[in-house]
């Protein structure tokens, strides 16, 4: 999609996650089996992300703005829950990216896209679908792996209000 007139604007090398994800998997050891919700998510990406610019941007938007918003809290929360120190949650670290500034830049790019109404509708529908796919993946991961979390006595019992959240994620 890098060559597409509208979707190409959303290809950012600094968001590349494969090296971080590979490092996390190496650190964590054996690869767990792929869960059905993850397979469904991957199938959807393969179906739409290579030849439908609005769908590509919809999934890109959902993934990266989520990672640069709540993901900035989720990464440290996972590290606390599983007793990780540095390795094992690098997927959530974006070196050289200032999340609030990046989110602003991203939204400005979205505001400038000039898709016809059918592609605008596709974008909105695909964002909704991407959210649902993400929710299904997280639900399956919770069901499969939540019991493996370790209780960190230094972690607050209920940190969902934002205490302990990185300051850039709060903006």
Regions found by a protein language model. Give the residues of each.
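Metal- and O2-centered redox machinery and metal/ROS homeostasis
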Residues: 1-171
């Amino acid at each position: 999609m890098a060559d597409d007139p509208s979707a190409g604007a959303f290809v950012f090398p600094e968001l590349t996650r494969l090296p971080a994800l590979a490092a996390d998997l190496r650190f964590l050891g054996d690869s767990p089996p792929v869960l059905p919700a993850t397979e469904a998510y991957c199938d959807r990406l393969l179906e739409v992300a290579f030849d439908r610019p609005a769908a590509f941007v919809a999934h890109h938007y959902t993934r990266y703005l989520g990672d640069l918003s709540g993901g900035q809290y989720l990464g440290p929360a996972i590290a606390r829950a599983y007793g990780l120190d540095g390795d094992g949650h690098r997927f959530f670290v974006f070196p050289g990216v200032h999340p609030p500034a990046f989110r602003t830049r991203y939204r400005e790019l979205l505001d400038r896209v000039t898709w016809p109404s059918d592609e605008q509708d596709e974008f909105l529908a695909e964002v909704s679908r991407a959210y649902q796919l993400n929710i299904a993946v997280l639900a399956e991961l919770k069901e499969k792996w939540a019991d493996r979390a370790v209780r960190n006595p230094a972690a607050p019992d209920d940190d969902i209000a934002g205490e302990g959240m990185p300051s850039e994620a709060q903006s």
